[in-house]
Amino acid sequence: MAEGGQAQQQPPQLGPGAAARGMKRESEVELPVPGAGADGPEPGLSKRPRTEEAADGGMQNEPLTPGYHGFPARDGQGNQEPTTTPDAMVQPFTTIPFPPPPQNGIPTEYGVPHTQDYAGQTSEHNLTLYGSTQPHGEQSSNSPSNQNGSLTQTEGGAQTDGQQSQTQSSENSESKSTPKRLHVSNIPFRFRDPDLRQMFGQFGKILDVEIIFNERGSKGFGFVTFENSADADRAREKLHGTVVEGRKIEVNNATARVMTNKKMVTPYANGWKLSPVVGAVYGPELYAASSFQADVSLGNEAAVPLSGRGGINTYIPLISLPLVPGFPYPTAATTAAAFRGAHLRGRGRTVYGAVRAVPPTAIPAYPGVVYQDGFYGADLYGGYAAYRYAQPATATAATAAAAAAAAYSDGYGRVYTADPYHALAPAASYGVGAVASLYRGGYSRFAPY
């Protein structure tokens, strides 16, 4: 009975050892088997090799039925999270039907179970490739934010591009609307405004063309104003330094005009803006006649009255200073002064007629100058004509000097006869005929200086 009681108490003693079956302990290895009798060593011997085999980690050699050795059934996945493989998470093949072909770039492993979740977002995520190891919850939560971020960046970039394009367009419009003036120098003297406009018109719209002239003609430079500053810069780059009719033109940006406060001389009544000294050079007998006007103011007893037009009396003094022999002073001198085309003086004009068929109308420019009836007579007009057209070929030395004085008395011709570049004939040949020959002899009034 005692052995039977020990045999009945044996399973409770083996209970704690059986609970920790998978762990190797020294007490369990050296634990003697109770109740080892004549027929008892065989269970003990069969128990020790199985314990050592289990201690060596031979889990793969266990029988497929867990309750074969009288132990409670163990959970094969209880403490095995670190050593599990991805196959352990895969559902059995029988629970999943065959997946359809991939749609919209989604991998085949997400075809069936997630088509309902992504049914509304497949069109939005055509370009997104999902990784197989990323949870779908995180993907679905991150992808809209990423998409919104990309959209925000795209909109910001589009706004930036739009601002830049607007800025560039405004700058282009400003540059197009800003006119620019170019200074063109060393151009041919025969060039006129249409020639300069034709030369620069190929680069853009031109607002204004101006060539600077003086009384002799072109000064060899001018200005061209473009409507667009870019066209002006392009024209300056292309035309600067080019050779036009043997002259190397220069094109530069025109600087601002510098207005100097020059002291203006009081202009005369007929438009002359000359000082008395320069005026005496242009017309010496004008200022010589003023002395005779002073003689007129001496009194009636020293002069001979002449009846003029409209009852106006002009007195010719009896005292006469012989400037030119045979010339009746002062009436003819004062009338000749007014006769000398004062309405054309100071301007570049064509060849003044050598023979004045019809005298001009009276210009009330100088006091005391009144046309007389006798001026149109043969005596006075013939004397004036003889003075103007005296030919030195049949004259003596005195008349040659008079003819030279006559040439100097012409206010406009005097400039050319005194010019050493144009007066190439000897002094005896001076006269109106010589001045006219200068015009006929290829003299260009557009000479530079």
Swiss-Prot record:
Residues 77-86, 118-138 have a biased composition (Polar residues). One of its GO terms (biological process) is positive regulation of gene expression. Detected in brain neurons (at protein level). Detected in heart, brain, embryo, lung, liver, kidney and ovary. Induction: Up-regulated by androgens in cultured motor neuron cells. The record marks R181, F189, R190, N214, K219, F223, R247, R257 as: Interaction with RNA. GO terms for cellular component: cytoplasm; nucleus. Keywords: Cytoplasm, Methylation, mRNA processing, mRNA splicing, Nucleus, RNA-binding. Coiled coil: none annotated. It is found in: Nucleus; Cytoplasm. Residues 180-256 form the RRM domain. Residues 1-186 are annotated as: Disordered. The modification Asymmetric dimethylarginine is found at R356, R388, R440, R445. The keyword Zinc does not apply. Pfam families: Fox-1_C (PF12414), RRM_1 (PF00076). Its main location: nucleus. Residues 1-21, 139-176 have a biased composition (Low complexity). Disulfide bonds: none annotated. InterPro entries: Fox-1_C_dom, FOX1_RRM, Nucleotide-bd_a/b_plait_sf, RBD_domain_sf, RBFOX1-3, RBFOX1-like, RRM_dom. RNA-binding protein that regulates alternative splicing events by binding to 5'-UGCAUGU-3' elements. Prevents binding of U2AF2 to the 3'-splice site. Regulates alternative splicing of tissue-specific exons and of differentially spliced exons during erythropoiesis. Seems to act as a coregulatory factor of ER-alpha. Together with RNA binding proteins RBPMS and MBNL1/2, activates vascular smooth muscle cells alternative splicing events. PANTHER family: ATAXIN 2-BINDING PROTEIN 1-RELATED (PTHR15597), RNA BINDING PROTEIN FOX-1 HOMOLOG 2 (PTHR15597:SF31). Interacts with ER-alpha N-terminal activation domain. Interacts with RBPMS; the interaction allows cooperative assembly of stable cell-specific alternative splicing regulatory complexes. This is RNA binding protein fox-1 homolog 2. It comes from Mus musculus. The gene is Rbfox2.
